[in-house]
Amino acid sequence: MRRTGRSYKPLLSQLKDHHIPVHPSSRAERAMESRTLLVLLFVGVVTIVSSGLERAAAQDDTDDGILPSSDVQPLVSNMIGQGFTVAAAVAQSLQTLIPIRSTLLIPSNNAIAGVDANLSQEDIINTLQYHVLTFPTSFEALSRNDVGAELPTMLQGEMITVTSNSPGNFTLNEVNITHPDVCSSTRFIACHGIDRVLAYNSSLVTAAGPEASPPFGAEQASPAPEALPPGTRSPNNTANPSNRKSNSTRSSASRYPVSE
């Protein structure tokens, strides 16, 4: 599904402000543009462009939807410590665009290298937003979702589906979470490392990186912020699934993130 220019053009304008080329003239420049823009998704620098929010000047005001400056360095340090060095570099340079109270799904450096350099600019923008869940959640809470549960993303109308919730193989859209709770030191944001780029469109499916990591076992997860995702849907499309009792034999607890 393609989005209209209403949300596309404002984000392109912001990318220009950060010296990201958006009108390449050669094949080499197009390849550089695609990879440069795609790494933005790994640190959640997508703003809520569909509502026309302007970038805030005061970074310490958490009401403007931007990550406070005091949380940027812990975010960067967490990413470097887990090997997501591309994400860390972009977070450091584009810190005024990182949204708060969200969950970032960050592909590995190897996954970035495998991205098709010929993606259209609109596909790139949509892909950026598709890697940001609209609520912060720890891996422990995320892993309690039923298979088939749909999680809302910043790409309007597009969901990410839980495709496996077994203890040693938790996947979203068949993509493994290999590094849960990467950003455990931040107050407002959660992020989890994945081994492939998530494709909102089946024609954009990419392969895992050349040295993809195995799935991470759920029992190793560490604490991180969690909240009930307002738009999460269960397999039968029941709203607010945290109010349901789970029938799972694996656990008697709710299989959905618990509200704070």
From Swiss-Prot:
Q: Where are the transmembrane segments?
A: 36-58
Record carries keyword Transmembrane helix: yes
In which compartments does the protein localize? Membrane
Gene3D superfamilies according to UniProt: FAS1 domain (2.30.180.10)
Which portions of the sequence form the region Disordered?
Answer: 210-260
Q: Supply the alphabetized keyword list.
A: Glycoprotein, Membrane, Transmembrane, Transmembrane helix
PROSITE patterns from the xrefs?
A: FAS1
Q: Which domain of life is it from?
A: Eukaryota
Which sequence ranges are listed under topological domain Extracellular?
59-260
- Give residue spans, biased composition: Polar residues: 233-254
> Where are the Cytoplasmic topological domains?
1-35
- Give the coiled coil ranges: none
For membrane topology, the record states: Single-pass membrane protein
What's an example GO cellular component term for this entry?
Answer: plasma membrane
Q: What is this protein called?
A: FAS1 domain-containing protein SELMODRAFT_448915
Organism encoding this protein: Selaginella moellendorffii
